């Protein structure tokens, strides 16, 4: 049907009959042929098969860990998810790119509406077929144009079913994409193992910054291990102003300034983040602040509690994975992207499993038996994926507000006299993120500090 519609498009410069100029302009823009130069490309799995296809991205060679996702939609969100850093992403969906790539538009909070980070994070893209003609009202460029602009190689015309079958049977493997030339498949130096790289250091913020809620009800510290934009949005939209810290920031030293601590998702092996694990352990020893972790944050919290993590054979990357809530018996369809899991048998006695994966029985969450601390391996913020478990953010924010109320009862001046740390952080409002509100916060904090000093 779409092909018949494309054939019906008038020649360049001619008008669509009975269509106003605005709609005509949009139609011409969204169905134009977005062609990028095609060259021979090769996808090589180390000690495995070689696949030949065509390049539709950047003219460069790359290597990394080959993983696959069974998600049907959401490729702009997946490819910008920092958790995919260093990985070559293979899509099982036969056709990718048919709705193009949207703009870097931001929402009322100053957060990206359609992407999970400002740049494409995956090392490479592998698809069976790529749509050169795209059609969607938010699209501004094709998938090939986007990959080329971001410097990411991409290959189409390969048997992704055979690739995924190999990865499922042999496990996630090192691989490479070469464009325009071929290398000896036996040269190990041509393969880079991202697991040997501290990937979190690459994607974490380099300095703290602040994002204000329109009507702030609480203040949450976010440990950024590669946080997704929609996680920040899920917190801010629920009335939490957030201050985002680098992954290795000594959060236990400033936790008393906040009503809650959140640990984000991120890429790579959780055991690389030893500083983060130490700071979280000290945080749980010295503070009763509510804590919530997602994905890598879940794994880091488990390590801090004394548990261990394990590497899965080929990971879980999809938007339709069932997870069972062990406290209610309810099943949630979840969005997941991880290659490691918590070894539930190593959880300390004061913790218990929260969710379990119904496909492979791996751990999907844990919760403390007596304190407001819990975490999930899956992504309740989705983007893309279902929102079955988004209520977990409500549970967390409720615990944060209760903690704030209890602290206010014991320390009435806690919120009226801002600390020098918070005044400084509020001055570092994230660029492009509600600068007016941020400035109001800075001015209010400065005024309150002046009144307190005068008294």
UniProtKB/Swiss-Prot annotation:
It catalyses: hydrogencarbonate + L-glutamine + 2 ATP + H2O = carbamoyl phosphate + L-glutamate + 2 ADP + phosphate + 2 H(+). It is found in: Mitochondrion matrix. Its main location: mitochondrion. Pathway: Amino-acid biosynthesis; L-arginine biosynthesis; carbamoyl phosphate from bicarbonate: step 1/1. Keywords: Amino-acid biosynthesis, Arginine biosynthesis, ATP-binding, Glutamine amidotransferase, Ligase, Mitochondrion, Nucleotide-binding, Transit peptide. GO terms for molecular function: ATP binding; carbamoyl-phosphate synthase (glutamine-hydrolyzing) activity; glutaminase activity. GO terms for biological process: 'de novo' pyrimidine nucleobase biosynthetic process; glutamine metabolic process; L-arginine biosynthetic process; pyrimidine nucleotide biosynthetic process. Its EC number is 6.3.5.5. Pfam families: CPSase_sm_chain (PF00988), GATase (PF00117). Residues 219-406 form the Glutamine amidotransferase type-1 domain. One of its GO terms (cellular component) is mitochondrial matrix. The active site is at residues 295, 379, 381. Residues 1-28 form a transit peptide. Small subunit of the arginine-specific carbamoyl phosphate synthase (CPSase). CPSase catalyzes the formation of carbamoyl phosphate from the ammonia moiety of glutamine, carbonate, and phosphate donated by ATP, the first step of the arginine biosynthetic pathway. The small subunit (glutamine amidotransferase) binds and cleaves glutamine to supply the large subunit with the substrate ammonia. NCBIfam families: CPSaseIIsmall, PRK12838.1. HAMAP family: CPSase_S_chain. Belongs to the CarA family. PANTHER family: CARBAMOYL-PHOSPHATE SYNTHASE ARGININE-SPECIFIC SMALL CHAIN, CARBAMOYLTRANSFERASE FAMILY MEMBER. Heterodimer composed of 2 chains; the small (or glutamine) chain promotes the hydrolysis of glutamine to ammonia, which is used by the large (or ammonia) chain to synthesize carbamoyl phosphate. This is Carbamoyl phosphate synthase arginine-specific small chain. The lineage of its organism: Eukaryota, Fungi, Dikarya, Ascomycota, Pezizomycotina.
């Amino acid at each position: 049907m779409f092909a018949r519609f494309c054939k019906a498009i008038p020649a360049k410069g001619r008008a669509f009959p009975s269509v106003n100029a605005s709609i005509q302009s949009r139609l011409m823009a969204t169905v134009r042929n977005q062609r990028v130069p095609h060259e021979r490309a090769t996808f090589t799995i180390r000690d495995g098969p070689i696949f030949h296809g065509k390049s539709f991205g950047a003219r460069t060679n790359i290597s990394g860990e080959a993983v696959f996702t069974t998600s049907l939609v959401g490729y702009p969100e997946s490819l910008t998810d920092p958790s995919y850093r260093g990985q070559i992403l293979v899509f099982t969906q036969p056709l990718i790119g048919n709705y193009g790539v949207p703009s870097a538009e931001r929402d009322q909070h100053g957060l990206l509406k359609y992407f999970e980070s400002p740049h494409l994070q995956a090392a490479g893209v592998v698809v069976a077929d790529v749509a050169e003609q795209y059609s969607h009202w938010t699209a501004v460029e094709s998938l090939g144009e986007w990959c080329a602009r971001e410097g990411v190689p991409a290959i189409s015309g390969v048997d992704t079913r055979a690739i995924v079958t190999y990865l499922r049977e042999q496990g996630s493997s090192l691989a490479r994409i070469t464009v325009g030339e071929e290398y000896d498949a036996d040269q190990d130096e041509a393969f880079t193992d991202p697991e040997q790289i501290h990937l979190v250091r690459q994607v974490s913020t380099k300095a703290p910054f602040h994002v204000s809620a329109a009507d702030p009800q609480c203040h949450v510290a976010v440990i950024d291990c590669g946080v997704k934009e929609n996680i920040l949005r899920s917190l801010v939209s629920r009335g939490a102003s957030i201050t985002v810290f680098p992954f290795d920031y000594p959060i236990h030293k400033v936790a008393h300034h906040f009503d809650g601590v959140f640990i984000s998702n991120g890429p790579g092996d959780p055991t690389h983040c030893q500083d983060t694990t130490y700071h979280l352990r000290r945080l749980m020893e010295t503070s009763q602040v509510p804590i919530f972790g997602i994905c890598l944050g879940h794994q880091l919290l488990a390590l801090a509690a004394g548990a261990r993590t394990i590497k899965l054979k080929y990971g879980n990357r999809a938007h339709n994975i069932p997870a069972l809530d062990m406290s209610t018996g309810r099943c949630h369809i979840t969005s997941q992207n991880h290659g490691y899991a918590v070894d539930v048998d190593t959880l300390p006695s004061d913790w218990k499993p929260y969710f379990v994966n119904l496909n492979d029985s791996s751990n999907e969450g844990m919760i403390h038996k007596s304190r407001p601390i819990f975490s999930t391996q899956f992504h309740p913020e989705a983007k893309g994926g279902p929102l079955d478990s988004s209520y977990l953010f409500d549970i967390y924010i409720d615990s944060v507000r209760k903690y704030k109320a209890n602290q206010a009862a014991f320390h009435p001046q806690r919120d009226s006299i801002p600390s020098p740390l918070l005044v400084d952080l509020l001055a570092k409002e994230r660029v492009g993120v509600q600068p007016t509100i941020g400035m109001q916060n800075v001015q209010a904090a400065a005024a309150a500090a002046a009144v307190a000093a005068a008294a």
